[in-house]
């Protein structure tokens, strides 16, 4: 059983930590070894985003490097690997295991079979249909439903990052606490108002860093990338050699088939949004469907390979989590502190105390900083970089000498500051606040996936107009049914996800529910105001 335990851990962390980092370099080699060397030296190390906590947040920029690859040169395995580093991260396993325990194994199988696989192949058809479009989802909507809805899609893609930005400084603070104190007690020693105030200060500081332009971004990313890459290799090396050195007791005992069967009730249903949140992001790979050799066959093959890779990673990771943490007695702060607990346990296996955990906490702090800085800058520039003056006021697009959209940054600051401080009125401790923001992300982020399915339904409806190289389902009624199913399932997950995962009808539960309902409407609704402001400005 020790061998099984460490084999699972090794496979999981090898997939999530080492392979994605290596792939970033490997994909680029198609353009020549000289280019690969330059990329490794100047871009690869500076821009590795931590695999333990996030899916890559600047992948759009990474993938743009692949534009140097000659036309039709990408193969199915290139597509699969590029997509894998877009979609997957360690946090996907941690968060869903914390919600469901080992039952999540069944949930992963369901999600991959009936949602993620058709979702990935839908993305393939849309990318093939609009092969010359560079705006992703907004381009798809613009061609099928007009520029007005295309603007709203682009706005949705940006504004859903606001809860993410509000949570990132929390993660930095937690990582610093583990690095300095060796445990998670820092966030318990101060009031939630004081901690969130410090969180806001951290956000303002790193927004200033982001506003300094690409030089500061590269410095932060370089340090973070090297640190997390080293920790990834270290974990893999220690995990694979542990069976010969240590003895490990499995935390979850008496595992049977019944352990994996969910009890379908309202509590279980409210956790589906986190699963949907975990598997999103495949649409970022769509611009490369027509750079694939024989895209009608190889692109769907790559997407199916992606589904298998992610499924294996999710299931092995969940089993490994069950071996480290008792599925029947999940710690209340597992979402908040799981990464540090894992390295702490690894240190215990090797009689190293907290050394590994502290090293990881420091590396993760740098990684979280890089993720925050890039996420402040990149999505906003995507929204404003090709803005239509009919929908976005010119004043919002004004930039400084560094190319920073000043007013766009100010808008981001206002929204994030509200989302950081407002919850302190009704949420009493930092652990619950962290989990609330994470669950809010699982409600808000999938809203952008809805536009993918809207575009697919529109393309199916206009099938005579578009002739893509790759078609997911040629039977029109069946294709329409699949598109409607994916849209409805995503919407259902978002709606049920708004209910807090805690004792119902308490004061804090009611407060969290109110915020979960209001936040998506307010954030998306703000996008309806800017066309009015733009119209007023243009009339003058």
Predicted regions span which residues?
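Loop-to-transmembrane helix boundary motifs in multi-pass membrane proteins
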Residues: 71-79, 195-197, 293-296, 305-310, ...
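Hydrophobic transmembrane alpha-helices that form the core helical bundles
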Residues: 118-125, 129, 133-199, 208, ...
């Amino acid at each position: 059983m020790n061998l099984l335990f460490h084999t699972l851990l090794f496979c999981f962390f090898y997939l999530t930590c080492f392979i994605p980092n290596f792939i970033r370099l490997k994909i680029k080699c198609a353009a020549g070894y000289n280019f690969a060397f330059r990329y490794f030296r100047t871009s690869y190390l500076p821009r590795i985003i931590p695999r333990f906590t996030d899916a890559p947040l600047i992948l759009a920029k990474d993938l743009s490097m692949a534009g140097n690859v000659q036309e039709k040169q990408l193969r199915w395995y290139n597509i699969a690997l590029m997509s894998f580093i877009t979609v997957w991260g360690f946090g996907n396993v941690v968060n869903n295991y914390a919600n469901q325990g080992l039952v999540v194994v069944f949930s992963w199988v369901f999600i991959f079979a009936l949602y993620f696989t058709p979702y990935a192949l839908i993305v393939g058809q849309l990318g093939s249909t609009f092969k010359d479009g560079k705006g992703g989802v907004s381009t798809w909507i613009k061609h099928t439903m007009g520029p007005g809805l295309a603007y709203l899609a682009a706005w949705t893609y940006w504004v859903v990052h606001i809860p993410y930005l509000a949570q990132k400084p929390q993660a930095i603070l937690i990582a610093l606490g583990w690095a300095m104190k060796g445990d998670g007690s820092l966030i318990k020693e101060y009031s939630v108002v004081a901690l969130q105030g410090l969180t806001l200060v951290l956000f303002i500081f790193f927004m200033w860093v982001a506003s300094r332009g690409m030089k500061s971004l590269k410095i932060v990313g370089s340090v973070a990338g090297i640190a997390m890459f080293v920790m990834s290799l270290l974990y893999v090396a220690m995990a694979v050699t542990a069976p010969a050195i240590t003895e490990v007791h499995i935390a979850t005992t008496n595992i049977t088939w019944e352990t994996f069967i969910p009890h379908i009730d309202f509590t279980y249903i409210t956790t589906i949004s986190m699963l949907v949140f975990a598997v999103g992001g495949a649409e970022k790979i769509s611009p490369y469907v027509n750079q694939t050799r024989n895209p009608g066959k190889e692109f769907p093959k790559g997407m199916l390979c992606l589904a298998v890779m992610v499924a294996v990673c999710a299931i092995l990771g969940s089993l490994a989590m069950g071996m480290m943490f008792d599925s029947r007695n999940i710690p209340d702060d597992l979402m908040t502190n799981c990464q540090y607990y894992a390295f702490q346990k690894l240190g215990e296996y090797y009689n190293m105390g907290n050394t590994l955990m502290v090293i990881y906490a420091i590396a993760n702090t740098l990684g979280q900083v890089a993720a925050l800085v890039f996420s402040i800058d990149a999505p906003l520039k995507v929204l404003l970089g090709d803005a239509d003056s009919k929908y976005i006021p010119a004043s919002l697009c004004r930039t400084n000498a560094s190319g920073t959209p000043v007013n766009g940054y100010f808008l981001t600051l206002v929204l994030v500051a509200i989302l950081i401080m407002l919850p302190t009125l009704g949420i009493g401790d930092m652990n619950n606040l962290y989990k609330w923001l994470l669950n809010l992300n699982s409600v808000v982020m999938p809203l952008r996936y809805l536009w993918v399915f809207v575009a697919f339904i529109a393309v199916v409806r206009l099938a005579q107009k578009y002739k893509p190289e790759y078609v997911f389902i040629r039977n029109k009624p069946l294709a329409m049914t699949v598109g409607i199913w994916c849209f409805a399932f995503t919407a259902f997950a978002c709606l049920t996800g708004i209910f807090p995962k805690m004792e119902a009808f308490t004061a804090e539960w009611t407060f969290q529910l109110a915020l979960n309902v209001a936040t998506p409407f307010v954030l998306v609704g703000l996008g309806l105001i800017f066309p009015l402001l733009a119209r007023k400005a243009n009339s003058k």
